[in-house]
Amino acid sequence: MERNTRKTLQGKVTSARGDKTIIVEVESHRSHALYSKRYRVAKKFAVHDENNIAKVNDIVTIMETRPLSKTKHFRLVAVKQAAMQGEK
């Protein structure tokens, strides 16, 4: 699979405890089939962070890749926005 055709997502880092692994929450909105109300859906992905550069509350871009472990199928592409100091 070529790199430019791989799925890229943007989300917020919720955990950076593991070595070279971060947990990223990706938010999307769906529309209810019958009532057409939009609602929020969030999904968490385990992401490979080779250099341990991402911190909690950073906004990051991730890209789909080959399976790196049982749960990791994404890798970190870039940190879009660093978290503010003191932010929880």
UniProtKB/Swiss-Prot annotation:
Known function: One of the primary rRNA binding proteins, it binds specifically to the 5'-end of 16S ribosomal RNA.
Subunit structure: Part of the 30S ribosomal subunit.
UniProt superkingdom: Bacteria
Family label: Belongs to the universal ribosomal protein uS17 family.
Signal peptide: none
GO MF annotation, one: structural constituent of ribosome
Protein name listed in UniProt: Small ribosomal subunit protein uS17
Disulfide bonds: none
One family name in Pfam for this protein: Ribosomal_S17
One Gene Ontology CC term in the entry: cytosolic small ribosomal subunit
PANTHER family (UniProt xref): 40S RIBOSOMAL PROTEIN S11 FAMILY MEMBER, SMALL RIBOSOMAL SUBUNIT PROTEIN US17M
Gene: rpsQ
A single GO BP: translation
HAMAP family registered for this protein in UniProt: Ribosomal_uS17_B
Cross-referenced InterPro entries: NA-bd_OB-fold, Ribosomal_uS17, Ribosomal_uS17_bact/chlr
Family annotation (Gene3D superfamilies): Nucleic acid-binding proteins
Protein keywords: Ribonucleoprotein, Ribosomal protein, RNA-binding, rRNA-binding
